Amino acid sequence: MLRSVKESFSTNRVHLGMDEAAQLGLGKYLRENGYTKSSVLIREHSARVFEICKKLGLEPMIWSDMYITANTGGGYYDLADDTDCSDWEKPDPDLGLVYWDYYNPEQKIYEKMIRVHQQLSNKVIFAGGSWIWNGISPNYSKTFTCTRAGLAACKKYHLPEVFCTAWMDNGAETPVDAVLPGLVLFAHLGFHEDFDEKALAEEFHDVTGASLNDFLELDALDSLFQNGQPNLDTDNPSKYLLYQDPLLGIFDRHIEDLDLDTERYYQDLADRLEICRKHTPAYDTLFAFYHSLASTLAGKADLGVRLKKAYDAHDLSTLETICEEVIPGIINDLSTTRLLREHLWMQDAKPFGYELVDIKLSGVIARLTSTRYRLRYYIDGRVKRLEELEADRLPYFLPGTPKRENLWHRIISGADLMDTI
């Protein structure tokens, strides 16, 4: 594999990964070899791979979390300010150690983590991120808060190298161009001692030809519960309110409890994004996609709430309107959204993987169509009740916890599609 990498790229630097192996040495290795501390195993394994890299003339780096969690037995960030690493298992001094953090809003946490890393290695690298992995929509408030805190700490402790990650969890649903504000922020902070909002906006326009403020409007797609505050909890309602089944209403309780007017919220956002689209012809399809998504959510987000309310009240007139007018309108909007997402994918990437996005979006259309059939049967008296709408709507999220669910298979049904064996 490493020979193939060396032949495929001009750089001699390679990232070996090796992160989040939380049960290292506690499975098959334990059964066959007996117990060895995880910290010893990660050191021995990384040393072996490092020797291969040296023979090939490659300069490797790895994620750092296993050198922390395997030594402490705790979480990656769960370290005391005065942590002493003198008796820890440590990597080879020439192996780059990458501290990844795009979660913490406070600079002091980054400073603590950097101090620990500098005890472990002389080649510490920082990896932050531009949040495009949280569902369908980017989270710029989280990106900006964490990046500013993280890079300020890197400057204070004179880290020579940083990079920006852009993960694609659960199917790369967010279009790749949404990464741009986070990337430009990284560059901006690399050339400015302090954050300068006006200079950043000018630099963003210089390198993209677009308005930063227009891009930042996309943050509102997942800020439904934030009341104007930054979405630091990484709530992602634009994903689960789109994908959830209208008859099951798994997330409806959270709309009801807060008495949110989701139709007005998302329609106002759609109107703003239509204006943004006119400002940014170079990113017309991106803004057309998010305009269409917001329009879809204006109809879809509280559909289950309206269905349940009308059903419980035996309001056949409202159910008739939902069946014959509301749902067809949502299907029409979502069909446009799906086609725009396909266009963006084929413009940005190879086709492989789009089938997953297509299945997800098309699945919503299929379930909306099935919902119409079920309603029609009930309205016409061919069935006496709809068992899906008989069930009480229960909270999905515990009180005081983030309203975030990024796994599609958990959103679409209470019956888990994943194999439990």
Sequence positions of predicted segments:
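Substrate-binding groove of N-acetylhexosamine-processing glycoside hydrolases
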Residues: R3, E7, T11-V14, E20, ...
